[in-house]
Structure formats: C-alpha cells, structure tokens
Amino acid sequence: MLSLQEFVQNRYNKTIAECSNEELYLALLNYSKLASSQKPVNTGKKKVYYISAEFLIGKLLSNNLINLGLYDEVKKELADAGKELIEIEEVELEPSLGNGGLGRLAACFIDSISSLGLTGDGVGLNYHFGLFQQVLKNNQQETIPNAWLTDQSWLVRSSRSYQVPFADFTLTSTLYDIDVPGYKTATKNRLRLFDLDSVDSSIIKDGINFDKTDIARNLTLFLYPDDSDRQGELLRIFQQYFMVSNGAQLIIDEAIEKGSNLHDLADYAVVQINDTHPSMVIPELIRLLTERGIELDEAISIVRSMTAYTNHTILAEALEKWPLEFLEEVVPHLVPIIKELDRRVKAEYKDPAVQIIDENDRVHMAHMDIHYGYSVNGVAALHTEILKNSELKAFYDIYPEKFNNKTNGITFRRWLMHANPSLSHYLDEILGEGWHHDASKLEDLLSYEDKAAVKEKLESIKAHNKRKLARHLKEQQGVEIKTNSIFDIQIKRLHEYKRQQMNALYVIHKYLDIKAGNIPARPITVFFGGKAAPAYTIAQDIIHLILCMSEVIANDPAVAPHLQVVMVENYNVTAASFLIPACDISEQISLASKEASGTGNMKFMLNGALTLGTMDGANVEIAELVGDENIYIFGEDSETVIDLYAKSAYKSSEFYAREAIKPLVDFIVSDAVLAVGKKERLERLYNELINKDWFMTLLDLEDYIKVKEQMLADYENRDAWLDKVIVNIAKAGFFSSDRTIAQYDEDIWHLN
C-alpha cells in the first residue's frame, strides 16, 4: 500500500501541504476505497441479510480509516504537512440514509458483523435526499431536501440489477455497494443499497413536496415520505416492496452462486427483519421460490426457517398495518400468498389478536413476521418482558420458544475511538488496547490505582470536548456557548413519548426560579437536537416552544448569564459526535414502557455523562450495572404506567391543577412567550398537555424537576461526581454492539 503522500503525489502531482482540504478529502476517500478494495468479502457458506429501511451510517472517512488500521498514520502524515484531519472531514457530506435510533442501530450492527468476521450484509435503499434537512427559522422547523449524493462518494455501482414487478409496470433496479471493513480484520462485508436510474429530483417543489404518484421518478427520493394521505401510504408500500423484492432476488442469486438448490436455502441465508418495514420479504421469498418450482408448503417451511424479526416498538402507530386494498393496488401478486398465510393462521388459532388480516381487512406486518419467522426478539430486557407479558402476549402463549432478548449495543469504534479520541487515547494509555476488541476490559478502570490522576484527566478531557463542541456550534450556527456551564443534553427524534416537552417545562421552571432570585451555582446550558416528522403537528409545536424559550431566555438579562437553551439545527451523526463527548447530564426521559431500548443512553454513558432517566428501555440495565448511586432515576415505573393506560386512569387536568405544575404549563401561553411565538402552535400544545397528555408528561414532571435539581447540586461535589463518571465508563462495555451481534449469531443466526 502506498503512503498517503505517494498517493496524493500520483493523483495531483502535489505534496500534501500544497493541497486544499477538498483535494485531500477526495484523495483520502479514494485512498480508503483502495485499501478496502484489497480486502476480500467474507464468504462463509451461511450469510445474514440485515434488511432495514434505514442505515444512519454517518460520515465514513475517519470510521473507515480506523477500521482499516490507517487512522493514526494518516493523521500523522497530515499533521506533519500542517493539515488537520478534523478539518478535512468537514468536506465530507453525511449520507442521508436514516433518521433515528433504528438506522443508527443498523449502522452499528453492520460494523460489528464485519468486525467479528461474520458473513453478512446490510440491505436497504439509496435515498437521494434522506428524511430532510432541518432549518430552524422564525422559531420553527422548516424542511428542505438533504442533498448528499455527489459524483465521488463511498457508493460503488455494481453490475447487479433486478426486475421488480408492480401491478401496472415493472421497474429495473440498480445496486450500489458501500464497503464495510471490519476493525483490523482481513475481510469486509457490504451495505447493499438499491436505487432507480429514473429517479428525478426536478419533481421536488416547495421544500420537500413532490408528486407522490410518479413512482418511477420519486421512489428513492426520500426516506419515510409523508404518509398522511392515501398516495403517501401507497408510496410507502411501493418503497418497501422495491426494497424487499430486490433483497429477496439478491439472496436467492447469491445462494445459487454458492451451490444452493434452493430446497436448502436456509443453510445459506438468514434474513433479519429490522422493524416491520421489510416484512413483505416473507411473501416475496415464498413467491420467488414457488416460481422456481418449489411446492407452496415447502416454500413456506423454508422461509419460516430463515427469517427472524426484531421488534423495536410497542407504539401501535409504528407496528405497520396496511389496508389489503392498498396491497391489491400495488402488489396484487403478493395478496394471494398473504391471504393463504392468514388462512393457515386462522385455521389453527381463533384469537383475532393473532390474525394477519383483521376484521377491517388490514394486514398486520408484525403478525406475519411472528407466525412465519423462527425468532422474535426485543431490544432490551424490559422491552422483551413487555412484549411477552403484554403487547405480544397472545403470540408468546403460542410460540414461547421464538421469543428472546438482544439488548442493543453501539460500536465503540465510532462512539469512543472516533468521537472522543482524547478519552480513547487516555484509556489506551492506562488500560492498554485490549478494550478495542473486548469492551468488558473497560472494567479495569475500577481497579486502576491512581484515582486522583484519572479524575483530573477526565475533567480536562471533558473541558476540551466542551470547547470543541462550542467551536463547532459557533461555526455551524453562530451560537456562543459558555464552556464553564453544565451541559444538559437531550438529542433524539422529536416524539411526545420521548418527552422533550417535559424538558421544556423544566426550562420554564428554571427560568422562573432564576427570575425569583434563585441563582444556580454555575450556568446551565440545555441542548436539544432532533427532527419532527413534517406531518407530526404536536412535535413541531414542541420544537416551537423550545425555540421560543431559547429566545425569551437570551433576551432576559436577569436570566441569560445563568441559563441558555440551544436547539442544534439538523441534528445528525456528525452533530452527535460533538455533543456526546461534551455532555454532563444525559436526558433519557421517555415515559416508562415506551422506549424499547435507546442507544443514546449508552453513548453518553461511555463518554462519561451521567444518566437522568426513567426506568425504561436500556436505562433499566444501565441502572443494574452501575448501581442506584451512579444514575439518577425518576418517575413512575412501567407497571404503573401500563396499569394507568389499562384503566384509563390518568387525568392530566388533575396534575395540571397542582401548585407546582400549573404556573409552568400556563407559561407556554404567557405574554412573554406569545410575544416571540405563534399563538396557534402554543395554544395547541398547552391544550394538549392539560386535556390529553397521552404520554403522561405531567405525571412525572414534579419528580423530574426534583431529581434534576439534586443532580445539579451533586455536580458541585466534583470528587463524588467523578467517582460516578468512572463507574459509568467502566460498566459501559456491556453495551458494545460486538456483544449484541455475537449473541444474535449464537442464538439466532448460527453463521459459523
């Protein structure tokens, strides 16, 4: 392999020092692709196909350099020439192939599959504009297309192409591959992304609006196109079928190339269905097998023995149910198969709760996955128990052997080695590099003798990361941040169950408290980051309130020195890699029972933030690992919440009437906020909280404020706080996605 200088010299006939950052980025892109191209693809007989609507992979340059073992030498060569890798990275556009935790998990998982030397590819779609680019203007979210595709990128066009049949036409796909090199492995896997050459961005008008009926030109333009109308729902079905039909044809082709006669397909392939978006892969595989001469009974048996389903939510809205008539309109050739699968279920089980097609002729995708797959897993211990005992109990009673838990994880290469090199290098220095391959070795931090030196170093690393974030936000948004403040951070997609509205009510509490003369020991900066779906009005209203409070506080000289609210624009993986290492307080405040797992909680913990959270998702396992004294838990537990729902016993108006709560909620529609906000938005949110509050914000609000105030007080005892930080970092090893993927392989995939 050439040195970077030799590669640059050959490409530009210049030295590194003479090149612009743009030239160096393109050189490094191609240098990394060359290094990766020299690694063979994993070729084990059996392969996992991880099918997902999202892969939130983030910028790939540094991540790939780390995995290829080139990062340190490249960084040194650049530094010797007076160049900074972090500045060159700014040139790279972040791939817009995902939105939230689902897509980020998929990205961590394909990294770990490759790093463990397992044979497995991600399969998805190549969205041209992703979800959207968020612009914050007039205290509101606006949306524009997020253009990220360029002539030179990580995508490599392959020669594979498939015919995908719809009711009235057939589309021809193009397959693009992105290499996924494992961490210092001799081999690699790939992310396989299907696209259409006919897609045309000129049909986009006015933000992210476009003709939803022009399938040949719109199919892969956007992730999750607005489905608030019939055409939007149909487009989602077109997208999902395009993804799974291509994926299924790829699976069959690759198995045949390895010697399969298709009767033994399950010996060659396992399909992991990531949430319900890829569920049509089940009837599509059955269709393709029967077309190739396999009897229907055998085809069903084969598919049942090679598909596994990961459930990511108990929110009914997210468990997809498509009207049968929509499927008849888009994929009529799948409908007889789905009806036959449903007929077999109804012949055996009379309970309507487990039927695939319900009495309203809606097709329940998760039900099909459970009946016609061999594994169903939740993504955190609590989540899996809720599935077994509540949400999917009717299925658990039938198939207890199918249900298993696989607590989510994160790749430490992205979220520690890349995002927080200062901490990563310090851990190498005092613990050695063993944790790179076995994250449980971080526990050695607990027995490291010179605790005082560790605490001093952790303080300086956190201060460095706060300055780094402040510089980044100054460049990106022009916002000035006090780096001596406590950094309190909530970054995740906007949804009522994640309760950004509760954090906003805390901000109001703190604002009024400071106005009353109660000055905090040091300044507090509250960061929010996340996008709201364009059709999700209340989520947009929550963003509006946050931005209004930011303005009210900034314009109040009595409060501004002590409190600041920052909404990070267009939150993405890049922003997260600046925010997470700088964080003191990690906000994980979903209503108990609603967050399947969460992975932000793990990233913050690994980077030395303390969790403020409910007993929900993976917070439960974090609490078990670190102990009650090293996490800040508030709010009602999941059993209480589930019981309140079951009895319709929660009345938000009763909580609103409380002395500690009413002034905070009323402030949403106060003159101060209305002066900078939109009356319609603020009143709608206010009425939602006092009359409905489906995700029980007011139920937990008082306890949330109390525990957060305790946390702020505890922060002032730096010695005790840093003891807690050390425990959190040391215990984070369990949440490595390498551990999660090893468990998927051992219990579900059986690749080796």
Annotate the PLM regions.
Residues 1-752:
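A conserved ligand/cofactor-binding region detector
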